[in-house]
Amino acid sequence: MWDYVKLVALGVVAAIAAYAASQARDLPYMVNMVEVALAAVIALIWVLRTMGDPKPSKDEYFDGVIRAGVIATTFWGIVGFLVAVVIAFQLAFPALNLEFGNGMLNFGRLRPLHTSAVIFAFGGNALIASAFYVVQRTSAARLFGGTALGWFVFWGWQLIIVTAATSYLLGGSQGKEYAELNWHLDILVAVVWVAYLIAFLGTIFKRKEPHIYVANWFYLSFIVTIAMLHIVNNLAVPVSIFGTKSVQLMAGVQDAMTQWWYGHNAVGFFLTAGFLGMMYYFVPKQAERPVYSYKLSIVHFWALIFLYIWAGPHHLHYTALPDWASTLGMVMSVILWMPSWGGMINGLMTLSGAWDKLRTDPVIRMMVVSIGFYGMSTFEGPMMSIKAVNSLSHYTDWTIGHVHSGALGWNGMITFGMLYFLTPRLWGRSGLYSLKLVSWHFWLATIGIVLYASAMWVTGIMEGLMWREVDAQGFLVNAFADTVAAKFPMYVVRGVGGVLYLLGGLIMAYNLWATVAKQPKTANLAVAVPAE
């Protein structure tokens, strides 16, 4: 019966999407609707082909979707890093801004593609896959909703990634940082995200373990908060239901405040709380040590959840935002430093008694460096939120360096460690294909991050000082073009750092493939047992 319901639903979706494509008022909308229709048809065929298949045992963990998530995370990571290298060199060498396809490959189109690829494709797939793995293992229960809900979340997320990418390349964007998707794709994100919440929360509800492990607290907080942020920030009235354009519900300073309430907390919950859930599970597992202080992890959780949501106004210092709101954001940001470092200390001290593994285990080394970058970024962020510091750093490349030291160092490195941990276990292999390749990846990525971040710190501070330099009469000394020319050497260094990081990602992709293809198999027990 359920299969027939799915067939009817997919048929209706395909028909509506095909009709919408035929009535489209602009190219991005038409292409997106064609993609949705094709996805629905492919899903319909897949349901037809699998209708008679035996149902999987309810005593086994649902690891198929997690394996797919590992593959997707690796693939989209490479795509995101590759686009990053292209746009880094486009900034250094503007001639690389090609006008092919009506500007499809210039910086303005590729930049949102890059941010979405690394945050929502690479990071999003990593979070979905790891959350599904962790919640099943710590609950000793199969994923709620079975294969249907799990695969809907996974393939729905891939559809969002593909439609977003094509929309950006074709010029479809609403121009909001980290929220460039137009209204019709915003709805798709909300639907898939609610399904993700149901799968995760349902698994916790049917858990066999009485205790809810702290990693699940962080995962759940990130899922719930991102849903709220996404829906409120993207409230809009479409100009036409057959076009991408819409009118935002809020305007002016209210829209700016809502946008950076969303933008900062996309960092705070998507890129921090979610990945802290990853840290609290995979670091103890890889180190084979319990969390240093479980009480500290609880304090860390509640302090972070309360404070982070207030910090958004620090993005709007010296703007039309009321001074009280700006000051409130600054104060909350400075206070946020303390729980953030509590989490960093908890992660690092989990290795107590196992520090020798840093010499022998490059995966642990990667995780430890990621925690170090988390600590550095969560000190630098509150410092940059102070108005006096922000007057120098705002609108400069210092902010870019700060974001990327966190994204590449914290999010990237902990994700790499998670992928190296999961791959042999999910495919039932005796171990990774090559620890030497992991070590190569570690050093290439670390050197790449240092080159990138330090180049942006240097050029950002230089840029801020050049902007504010005045002569004896009070006139500006430097034209804007002078500041751009002065940044050229550091832009090249940034590009080189990006190339090294990309090479590390390619080495990882080969190592993971070789682990599955060339390593001997072992018994792979995916049976629901007391918390692992």
From Swiss-Prot:
Residues reported in the UniProt entry to bind heme b 2; high-spin:
402
Q: Where in the cell is it found?
A: Cell membrane
NCBIfam families xref list: ccoN
Give the source species: Rhodobacter capsulatus
Asked whether the keyword Manganese is assigned, the reply is no
Q: What is its EC number?
A: 7.1.1.9
Query: What's one Pfam family here?
Result: COX1
This protein's cofactor list reads: Cu(2+); heme b
Q: Name one GO molecular function term.
A: heme binding
Q: What class of enzyme is it?
A: translocase
Catalytic activity field? 4 Fe(II)-[cytochrome c] + O2 + 8 H(+)(in) = 4 Fe(III)-[cytochrome c] + 2 H2O + 4 H(+)(out)
| Keywords of this entry | Cell membrane, Copper, Electron transport, Heme, Hydrogen ion transport, Ion transport, Iron, Membrane, Metal-binding, Respiratory chain, Translocase, Transmembrane, Transmembrane helix, Transport
Sequence similarity: Belongs to the heme-copper respiratory oxidase family.
User: Any idea what this protein is called?
Assistant: Cytochrome c oxidase subunit 1
The way this protein sits in the membrane is described as: Multi-pass membrane protein
Question: Could you tell me what this protein does?
Answer: Cytochrome c oxidase is the component of the respiratory chain that catalyzes the reduction of oxygen to water. Subunits 1-3 form the functional core of the enzyme complex. Co I is the catalytic subunit of the enzyme. Electrons originating in cytochrome c are transferred via the copper A center of subunit 2 and heme a of subunit 1 to the bimetallic center formed by heme a3 and copper B. This cytochrome c oxidase shows proton pump activity across the membrane in addition to the electron transfer.
Residue stretches spanning the membrane: 1-21, 27-47, 69-89, 115-135, 143-163, 185-205, 212-232, 263-283, 296-316, 328-348, 366-386, 403-423, 442-462, 496-516
